[in-house]
Regions:
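N-terminal/domain-start alpha-helical segments
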Residues: 1-122
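Short alpha-helical interdomain "coupling" segment at the junction between an upstream regulatory sensor module
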Residues: 123-127
Length: 128
């Protein structure tokens, strides 16, 4: 399963990539934050999930989430330092499938990724 990491902090990007690859996911990093939703939607094969930071240079994670949900049903997990409950509520209402604050606990993050992916697979199986 392919997971896209949209994170501006190089240390966190590296940590996430290593964590995901150790859990046998394919991890792809986006480092250019211009037309990010379009970059993600044009990936072949399409990603199975996006880990999305909220605070990015040039483009907000909130805007990226909104654009992605207009054009795809790729699940999104916000992974952000924004701890305000209104930010979390806004993220979920705009289409994010989960909202995790930094610093994150790696086993909990992997568990929540697994839950979102299972829910998505189950939902897609029902459509078939």
């Amino acid at each position: 399963m392919k997971i896209v990491i949209v994170e501006d902090d190089p240390g966190i990007r590296k940590e996430l990539k290593q964590l995901l690859e150790n859990a046998f996911y394919e991890a792809e990093i986006i480092e250019e934050f211009k037309d990010t939703a379009e970059q993600i939607c044009s990936m072949i094969p399409a990603p199975d999930l996006v880990l999305l930071d909220w605070n990015l240079p040039g483009e907000s994670g909130f805007d990226i989430c909104t654009k992605l949900k207009e054009h795809s049903d790729i699940p999104i997990i916000f992974l952000t330092s924004r701890t305000d409950s209104m930010d979390e509520l806004t993220g979920i209402l705009k289409g994010a499938d989960d909202y995790i604050t930094k610093p994150f606990n790696p086993p909990i993050l992997l568990a929540r990724i697994g839950v979102v992916l299972k829910r998505t697979i189950d939902k897609n199986a029902e459509k078939s």
